[in-house]
Amino acid sequence: MPSADFPAFYLGQSAFSDPGAHLPRYAALPADPRRLARIARNVVIHRLEGPLFHHHIPTDRLHHDAETRYLDDILRLITERDPAPLTHPRAPADRFVGVCRDLALLHCSFLRHVGVPARLRCGFADYLGPDGFHADHVATEYWDERRGWLLADPQLADPRVADACRVDFDPMDVPRDRFLVAGRAWRTIRADRAAADSFGVHPPDQGPLNGEWFVAHSTRLDLAALNKVETLLWDTWGSDSTNTPHAPYDEVAHLTVGPVDLPAARRLFAEHDALRTPKTVLSLAPFNGPREVTLR
């Protein structure tokens, strides 16, 4: 299947997905994307999943694990807690306490290692929150030789999680109307086909992390991820929440919805100061407060 997405670009690891000194632990990984999703799922617990797994997550791990940007550091924590091979499922108490981005990054790293082009996509899922709400989320997009790019949600690779979310689709082939890449969400609210505050971390009656500014932020993260810059979800740069210019995000949406125009997306990311990830970002850590972080 021909593609304008240049899947070969997504075979190599990024600074964020590189296992570094832990590469030998990848030797026993299978080549099957579905099995790789389950392996990633079995070494990570989402920090909101304590009740589902009947596990009390220690406060220090709840607050600090998901601040780990780079996969080599994530793998270090996983193996310090249990030195078994990565293919060995961990007990909840021995897992890395992360978020959707961490699961997707681990899955993406595995896929790239075994020769499957893969990338992160930032956007919004309609199966993680109340009806009508699209929750901030990250999925893996991987290349299938027959069908092209498919969306996978490794968070759903554990049947307990899939059942709790009441999903009725294959987690390795997420329908694109159930997970909207950020540019599509941006287009949806710009066309008044959905309320802006129906996209975010939570609905407006639960807090302020929703709305047009938040979708713009996710659109910026998705462009960065397509350029293999897979930052934390709360790493920020560019426009603030009080001033969201439409034109840059309209352009990002044009390039990233449907077949990605990769050369144009790479050019835009390199040339647009407000869209390009700077060397130093402002990280709005949910538990630890804001701080400036210089990236590797």
Label for each model-derived stretch:
Residues 63-138:
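Active-site neighborhood of thiol-dependent amide/isopeptide-bond enzymes
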Residues 24-29, 93-94:
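Asp/Glu-centered strand-loop micro-motifs enriched in Gly/Pro and often flanked by an aromatic residue
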Residues 24-25, 33, 107-110, 139-144:
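Functionally constrained cores in energy, signaling, and assembly domains
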Residues 31, 144-146, 296:
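Generic structural signal for short, solvent-exposed loop/turn connectors between secondary structure elements
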Residues 27-87:
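N-terminal, Lys/Arg-enriched amphipathic/low-complexity engagement segments
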Residues 2-15, 37-47, 54-60, 79, ...:
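His-Asp-centered catalytic microenvironments across diverse enzyme cores
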Residues 283-296:
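A eukaryote-biased signal for long
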Residues 14-23:
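Generic N-terminal amphipathic, Lys/Arg-enriched alpha-helix
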